């Protein structure tokens, strides 16, 4: 039987340091380059980071199939893609969740979900979770925005109410993209991602790296 989803449960932390304000060493920092990857997609192809070299801006976001913060905000994300796709912004989704924690997050369900909803992004499967570790993915959804040189310029949430996107008052991702495309620095480059934690293989469903626990 799969574990019951409780989006409001605090992550399971493994050290007393979790209660202290410490540097976020687990996830990418502003200015870091996008780590390489090569992953299978729901369209039957395999994609590497270099396949998106022609795009001026690359938005990589970690997502899944089951999380209510994902399903509650997917249509808002779709609108963001449609708004910025004509400006050279490319969106790439990655599912790194363990299928042994939530069977809905397996690859066949990814294919089915894309077929049903027709989302305007590439949907990649990170079964080994190596890409999630390289990027330091914390939540689903968790967004990373990279400039033409593939340096990180924004990381965190897309909106402040992903579970009920119609109630969103702050559109952090849109603002970051608008500022960057206008040639301006991103005024708020880091926000806490809001969502379900990544489901790590062999870990409790609510486990997160200790150094992340105070910052999500």
Would you name each region that the model predicts?
Residues 207:
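Short terminal or interdomain "cap/linker" segment that borders an active site or interface and mediates
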Residues 2, 6-189, 204, 212-216:
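Chalcogenol-based redox active-site neighborhoods
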Residues 192-204:
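A short, charged, Gly/Pro-tolerant segment at domain boundaries
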């Amino acid at each position: 039987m799969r574990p019951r989803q409780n989006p409001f449960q605090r992550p399971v932390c493994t050290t007393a340091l979790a209660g202290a304000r410490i540097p976020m060493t687990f996830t990418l920092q502003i200015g870091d380059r996008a780590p390489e990857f090569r992953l299978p997609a729901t369209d039957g192809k395999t994609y590497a980071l270099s396949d998106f070299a022609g795009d001026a801006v690359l938005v990589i976001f970690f997502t899944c199939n089951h999380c209510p913060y994902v399903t509650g905000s997917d249509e808002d994300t779709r609108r963001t893609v449609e708004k910025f796709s004509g400006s050279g912004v490319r969106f790439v989704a990655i599912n790194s969740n363990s299928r042994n924690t939530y069977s809905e997050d397996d690859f066949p369900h990814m294919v089915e979900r894309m077929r049903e909803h027709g989302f305007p992004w590439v949907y990649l499967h990170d079964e080994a979770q190596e890409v999630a570790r390289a990027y330091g993915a914390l939540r689903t959804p968790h967004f990373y925005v990279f400039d033409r040189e593939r340096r990180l310029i924004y990381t965190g949430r897309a909106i402040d109410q992903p579970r009920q996107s119609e109630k969103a008052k702050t559109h952090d991702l849109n603002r970051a993209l608008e500022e960057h495309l206008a040639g301006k620095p991103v005024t708020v480059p880091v926000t806490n991602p809001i969502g379900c934690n990544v489901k790590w293989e062999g870990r409790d469903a609510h486990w997160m790296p200790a150094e992340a626990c105070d910052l999500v």
